[in-house]
Amino acid sequence: MKKYISNIEISTNQGTNAQIWENIFSQKEWGKYPSENLIRFIAKNFYNVKDRSKINILELGLGTGANLWFCAKEGFSVSGIEWSKTGVERFKQRLENENLSHHIQEIKIGDYEQKLDEFEDESFDAWIDGYSLAYNDFKKTKIIIEKAIKKLKKNGKFFSITPSFNNEGFIKDEKLPYHTCKPTHGSDAFTGIIRYCDEKDIKQLYQGEN
């Protein structure tokens, strides 16, 4: 597996997003460490908890597991949903290699909208999304977020990163659903159909049912 390779070398940008990402994860090394923003979110909300193993964190779209690896390494209990079987296998292998597997609660492979129904309501202290939800259209993303919020305990938190139209390579395509595009250059090139948000979209997506 090449550690440094561009998506254009391995992706035709054809097929479903799930198929495209399975192909990427099976041929390319991926990020192994979380963003500073994710680290700050976890630290601010949960570092002072006496027993970190009691804190349950769910990731929507764990990829190869950089975020959940960090959470597990910091002593938290982790669960996740991911399209890619290869991504999940790489995550589990990394945790096994570092003797962190005991922090894994549940990992499910499949569609977020469907798999969220398999988790109990009010069972997580936080859920996180490191850009993965952007690979769902606006309508589906809203459904997923509403379901994910129901999985939070009282006073639970969530962390989500979503792109704007200002991202490099984002070009409007009227043939695609609302505020989605299929970049062929920029950091998101050849990763499938991606949704972007303006300020109004963000309010509609994240305000919840109430």
Protein language model features and the residues they cover:
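Class I (Rossmann-like) S-adenosyl-L-methionine-dependent methyltransferase catalytic domain
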Residues: 2-55, 63-117, 140, 157-210
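Conserved beta-strand/loop positions that form the S-adenosyl-L-methionine
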Residues: 60
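Conserved sugar-transfer catalytic core signal across GT-A, GT-B, and GT-C glycosyltransferases
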Residues: 67, 132, 144
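Hydrophobic pocket-lining residues that define ligand/cofactor binding sites across diverse proteins
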Residues: 95, 136, 152
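A short acidic, Gly/Pro-enriched loop at the edge of an enzyme's catalytic core
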Residues: 117-127
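A short SAM/SAH-binding and catalytic strip from SAM-dependent methyltransferases
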Residues: 125-140
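A short glycine-rich, Lys/Arg-flanked "PGG" loop and its adjoining helix->strand segment in the class I
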Residues: 142-154
